[in-house]
């Protein structure tokens, strides 16, 4: 609803009058809770032919996650050895579980460290093994926000699907605080966000 309202305000500024949208017929279904502890199949309708999950999970690296968050990751990944996995990888694990019986796509704004070091095989190994590919990605950029106390992190955006077409798309940031530039890609983007096989 908020995005719809903002778009209506922009339209009103451009043409002088917003569209008649009352009574409001579009409503959001907001669920309050820990997304990693909720059963997503209870929240997202099974009747959908495709489900799209995307978001901006918390930016917590391995050094800043709590004991409880580390246990959540162990439970989600089904292993005691989560090593340096960032907390955000829990959302990837939830998607792998959720999409075992459904079709769809998922994408997250995450800490850039998921594409570096020992996180790469721990995160991307299970994703690729389950038949997912990187459909699009934005390489490292500096997070910016108008919010007070904003996070000072470097991020990537990675989107996944199980389709072979279209060709994947990749963007780079020549200036880490600037605008993205498209990068030519062949048949695949690998876990390090470069053109090449996994």
What are the roles of these predicted feature ranges?
Residues 1-20, 24-25, 35-198:
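Signature of N6-adenine DNA methyltransferases within the class I
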């Amino acid at each position: 609803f908020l995005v719809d309202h903002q778009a209506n305000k922009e339209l009103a500024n451009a043409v002088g009058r917003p569209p008649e949208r009352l009574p409001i017929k579009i409503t959001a279904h907001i669920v309050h809770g820990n997304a990693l502890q909720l059963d997503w199949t209870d929240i997202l309708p099974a009747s959908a032919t495709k489900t799209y999950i995307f978001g901006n999970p918390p930016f917590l690296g391995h050094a800043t996650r709590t004991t409880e968050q580390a246990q959540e990751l162990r439970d989600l990944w089904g292993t005691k050895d989560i090593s340096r996995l960032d907390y955000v990888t829990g959302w990837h694990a939830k998607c792998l579980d959720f999409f075992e019986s459904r079709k769809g796509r998922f994408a997250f704004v995450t800490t850039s460290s998921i594409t570096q070091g020992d996180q790469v095989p721990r995160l991307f190994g299970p994703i690729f093994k389950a038949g997912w590919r990187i459909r699009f990605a934005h390489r490292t950029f500096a997070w910016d926000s108008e919010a007070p106390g904003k996070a000072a992190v470097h991020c990537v955006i990675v989107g996944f699907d199980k389709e072979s077409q279209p060709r994947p798309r990749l963007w780079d940031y020549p200036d880490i605080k600037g605008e993205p530039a498209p990068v030519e890609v062949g048949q695949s983007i690998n876990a390090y966000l470069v053109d090449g096989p996994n």
